[in-house]
């Protein structure tokens, strides 16, 4: 199986070109776990398939390093857009990508050599009702700074879906974020039927925030694009910034520029990089 390893701000995945590779559906979860293993596999946060689509030039399927399939991945979207453009699957610089969470619009920014350094993705409108997250409780109600007890401590949660669920908590100092302690407890909390990505945010100013994440199905990662989008939406909902404002989000792996537009869409701009290409031969039944 030919693969390309790529990363967006250190959030790395093994990318498989399914225009050329034929994989068995029933083996995909186990394959994702195997290739993501840093000791016995290639090493990554998961596996992303770049597939043909009836609705768009390309389709993205995301598998976490535990084998579960995710609806969306912001960092993955940027890398898929870069791959699709550089490999000639699209000619335009703006095009749709199909995800399990719906269609998203990607715009690549090629350099003079025709290679893509950065990508802007229109992540669409955030979903804020409990039923859309999903989160148990009154279906239509928004969850903004809602008291929520985790362990023996009370936090204030803001819940946002960017095609996948996020629970955001604001803290005074990002270095004190209890990611390893609170992340796994909240990730699989019964209040979130589909589990949830857990984010901690420190607001520096209306144009700058710090961000840490415990990703659903992956644990601590260097970056989470949809999480950064959700964090900016949550910052607006809590009055720390405003719609239409570009916000720099500092993640462990680097920076993203996010804005929640007046029309409701969320734009994300950031880097996408290719690390290496190779052939994976272990454990395949074909």
Curated annotation (Swiss-Prot):
Principal subcellular localization: cytoplasm
This protein's name: Diaminopimelate epimerase
Subunit structure: Homodimer.
The protein's enzyme class: isomerase
Alphabetized SUPFAM superfamilies for the sequence: Diaminopimelate epimerase-like
Lineage: Bacteria, Bacillati, Bacillota, Bacilli, Bacillales
EC number annotated for this UniProt entry: 5.1.1.7
Entries under Gene3D superfamilies matching the protein: Diaminopimelate Epimerase, Chain A, domain 1 (3.10.310.10)
């Amino acid at each position: 199986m030919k693969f390309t390893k790529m990363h967006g701000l250190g959030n790395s995945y093994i990318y498989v070109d399914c225009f050329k590779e034929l994989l068995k559906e029933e083996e995909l979860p186990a394959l994702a776990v195997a290739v993501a293993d840093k000791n016995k596999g290639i090493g990554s946060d998961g596996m992303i398939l770049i597939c043909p689509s009836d609705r768009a030039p390309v389709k993205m399927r995301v598998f976490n390093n535990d084998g579960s399939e995710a609806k969306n991945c912001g960092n993955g979207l940027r890398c898929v857009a870069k791959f699709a453009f550089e490999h000639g699957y699209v000619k335009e610089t703006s095009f749709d990508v199909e995800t399990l969470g719906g269609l998203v619009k990607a715009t690549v920014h090629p350099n003079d050599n025709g290679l893509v350094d950065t990508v802007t993705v229109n992540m669409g409108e955030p979903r804020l009702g409990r039923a859309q997250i999903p989160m148990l409780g009154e279906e239509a109600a928004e969850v903004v700074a809602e008291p929520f007890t985790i362990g023996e401590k009370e936090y204030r949660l803001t819940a946002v879906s960017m095609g996948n669920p996020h629970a955001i908590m604001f803290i005074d100092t990002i270095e004190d974020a209890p990611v390893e302690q609170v992340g796994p407890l909240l990730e699989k909390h019964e209040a979130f039927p589909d589990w949830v990505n857990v984010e901690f945010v420190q607001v520096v100013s209306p144009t700058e925030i710090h961000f840490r994440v415990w990703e659903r199905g992956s644990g601590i990662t260097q970056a989470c694009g949809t999480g950064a989008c959700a964090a900016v939406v949550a910052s607006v909902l809590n009055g720390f910034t405003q719609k239409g404002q570009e916000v720099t989000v500092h993640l462990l792996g680097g920076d993203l520029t996010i804005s929640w537009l007046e029309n409701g869409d969320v734009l994300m701009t950031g880097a996408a990089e290719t690390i290496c290409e190779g052939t994976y031969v272990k454990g395949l039944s074909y």
